[in-house]
Amino acid sequence: MKRRGIARTTAMAMAAAMILTACGGGNTDQSTNAPAGGSAQTATDNGGSGEITKTDIVVAMGADVVTLDPAGQQDTTSGVLIHHVYSTLMDIDEEGNLVPDLAESYEMKSDTEYTFKLREDACFSDGTPVTAKDVKFTYDRAKDMPKTKSNTSKIAEVIADDDYHVTFKLTQPYAAFKTIVTQTNLSIVSEAAVTAAGDAYGDVENVLGSGEFTVTEWVPNDHYTLTKNEKYWGTEPIATSITVRVIPEGSARTIALEAGEVDLVWNVDPTDCANVEAN
């Protein structure tokens, strides 16, 4: 199963995919491709079976997102949001295998050349198609951005062969390249949207991705809301909306969970784990 596919199975799994860890751990400054793993601490509305069946999910996290622009993302919290709003060329499944996302297949023509075939039905949330030009634009832009330079340093050239084929030429053989194209900070952006918005790209009204959800509201340091993308080209998620509340204090997140104010909580403090699990 694709890691992104976890979010499509049930509403509980949709929310669980947004949780890196439940008890212990913390927010790290790194790019992330599919935030999964660990066990999510949840409140349920179905008699305690452990599965959330509601479609409007409320999640408590300890920190806010930093950016809505993939090329500016290096923190995990922003990566969680970006993963659900944008798509990458490839993804990694639960077994660690490289699987298709926007690209349905790829061909390794040599140690330094890869060609990806894009899905022809993939589109951004405004209905415009995702093309090889958008992929080229994304990677060319990333080479000039401080937080994505390292990921793209071994890419010599990106060529849009036609609308749905894109070729990467590397400076040297690079075994990690196939995982680089799964990174959230290399999620594909719309050339038209970024060009039109200029420096304002990343504002809520300018964000345009091709993932399962769109960002409909962001109140910094308070909450953000994701709404199901009606133009999504993949399997429809069961969750129709996800509201993420920023609650910095760990004990306050736990209290909100136990009171039923939130359905899931990011990083239950170790001292509260036993109480949450027993409740």
Label the model's feature ranges:
Residues 149-152, 274-279:
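Ligand-binding "clamshell"
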Residues 60-109, 140, 208:
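N-terminal lobe/hinge region of extracytoplasmic solute-binding protein
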Residues 53-66, 104, 113-117, 135-139, ...:
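Short, well-ordered beta-strand elements
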Residues 97, 182-236, 241:
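Gly/Pro-rich hinge or "lid" segments in bacterial periplasmic/extracellular proteins
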Residues 104-145, 167, 253-256:
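Aromatic- and charge-enriched surface segment that lines or borders ligand/interaction sites
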Residues 230-275:
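Ligand-site clamp/hinge motif
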Residues 107, 150-193:
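Surface-exposed binding/hinge segments that line
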Residues 23-39:
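Bacterial lipoprotein signal-peptidase II cleavage site
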